């Protein structure tokens, strides 16, 4: 994979790009970005939130945040009755951590959400957004990014989340099931209107779905 070309294509879209050879280097890079973002704030006053992400769990970034003393805000730690409010609060975080469902070789991020809170924070709200992306999520076109999400990402996430949708059997169909449907919102990010807001760390490992 030509990471140098991929990073150039991301940079031309007004987003910052970084390369990490493994999970450990990805976490180190993310912490360095956060350090540069916090200005004169104490770490304990820098709020960090995240969207649901297997990649973030795999790299260990949440544990690193706790060790470094950042004010981590986990909306998923709240009782189900309070999670909707908590997810709204995450939009006010200083830093939002996430991965992506797919990214094209030309640097376009492609994401599909069930509730929309994750893609909402990607687009607007938090001052900084840091993506950690494994090499398995790179596709050649938007069309193949969408295909990857429908055939790999959504089915695996549906099983992980215990959803009662057709894609749990590996056959993704355009279902319309309240509270269950995985593919309610589709977002393609082709440009960041605010320079310095979006930071993308590419990791030379397979991570997440």
Please describe what each predicted stretch is.
Residues 2-87, 91-97:
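N-terminal active-site beta-alpha-beta segment that forms phosphate/nucleotide-binding
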Residues 89-209:
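Conserved phosphate- and dinucleotide-binding cores of soluble alpha/beta proteins
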């Amino acid at each position: 994979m030509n990471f140098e070309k991929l990073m150039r294509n991301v940079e031309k879209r007004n987003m910052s790009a970084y390369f990490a050879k493994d999970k450990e280097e990805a976490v180190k890079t993310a912490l360095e970005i956060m350090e540069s973002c916090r200005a004169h704030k104490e770490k304990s006053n820098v709020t960090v939130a995240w969207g649901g992400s297997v990649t973030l769990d795999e790299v260990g970034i949440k544990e690193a945040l706790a060790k470094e003393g950042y004010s981590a805000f986990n909306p998923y730690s709240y009782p189900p009755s309070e999670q909707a409010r908590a997810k709204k609060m995450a939009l006010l975080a200083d830093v939002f951590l996430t991965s992506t469902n797919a990214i094209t070789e030309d640097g376009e991020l492609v994401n599909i959400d069930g509730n929309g809170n994750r893609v909402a924070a990607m687009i607007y709200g938090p001052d900084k957004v840091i993506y950690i992306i494994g090499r398995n999520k790179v596709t050649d076109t938007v069309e193949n990014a969408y295909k990857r999400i429908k055939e790999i990402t959504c089915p695996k996430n549906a099983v992980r989340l215990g959803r009662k949708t057709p894609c749990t059997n590996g056959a993704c169909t355009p279902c319309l099931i309240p509270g269950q449907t995985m593919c309610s919102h589709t977002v393609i990010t082709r440009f960041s209107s605010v320079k310095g807001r979006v930071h993308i760390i590419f990791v030379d490992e397979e991570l997440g779905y």
